[in-house]
């Protein structure tokens, strides 16, 4: 507990919150071009082949972005929209690709949580 004199001299410093998506430069999303599309394995207790893409953003920064949903049509030179949001079991993956915008197709045959995966309503 500081004395009043110490508070007069120094004052209290505000906590600085760390930016979790620095590559987006304050934007909600950023456009980018896929430079590499590949699969990775997750951290220890989990086991799978997670689909990820290396994306060069319009801000000039290259990031690793997760491709959510079952199946995708992405390849090198595909234009994608990238949003923030990390994947807990993939170290270094702090961005996700928005399904159903630009060159990314929505998930086929999706019935629930359709808006998250860019899936149109089935008739």
Curated annotation (Swiss-Prot):
Taxonomy, superkingdom: Bacteria
Q: 3-methylthioaspartic acid modification sites? A: 89
Which GO BP terms apply?
translation
Which Gene3D superfamilies does the entry mention? Nucleic acid-binding proteins (2.40.50.140)
Biased segments, Basic residues type: 108-123
The UniProt entry, under CDD domains, shows:
Ribosomal_S12
Molecular function GO terms recorded: rRNA binding; structural constituent of ribosome; tRNA binding
Which Gene Ontology cellular-component terms appear in the entry? small ribosomal subunit
Q: Which Pfam families match?
A: Ribosom_S12_S23
| Stretch list, region Disordered | 1-32, 103-123
Kindly state which keywords UniProt assigns to this record, in alphabetical order. Answer: Methylation, Ribonucleoprotein, Ribosomal protein, RNA-binding, rRNA-binding, tRNA-binding
Main role? With S4 and S5 plays an important role in translational accuracy. Interacts with and stabilizes bases of the 16S rRNA that are involved in tRNA selection in the A site and with the mRNA backbone. Located at the interface of the 30S and 50S subunits, it traverses the body of the 30S subunit contacting proteins on the other side and probably holding the rRNA structure together. The combined cluster of proteins S8, S12 and S17 appears to hold together the shoulder and platform of the 30S subunit.
PANTHER family to which the protein is assigned, alphabetical: 30S RIBOSOMAL PROTEIN S12 FAMILY MEMBER (PTHR11652)
Assembly behavior: Part of the 30S ribosomal subunit. Contacts proteins S8 and S17. May interact with IF1 in the 30S initiation complex.
- Which family is it part of? Belongs to the universal ribosomal protein uS12 family.
Protein's UniProt name: Small ribosomal subunit protein uS12
Q: Which organism is it from?
A: Cutibacterium acnes (strain DSM 16379 / KPA171202)
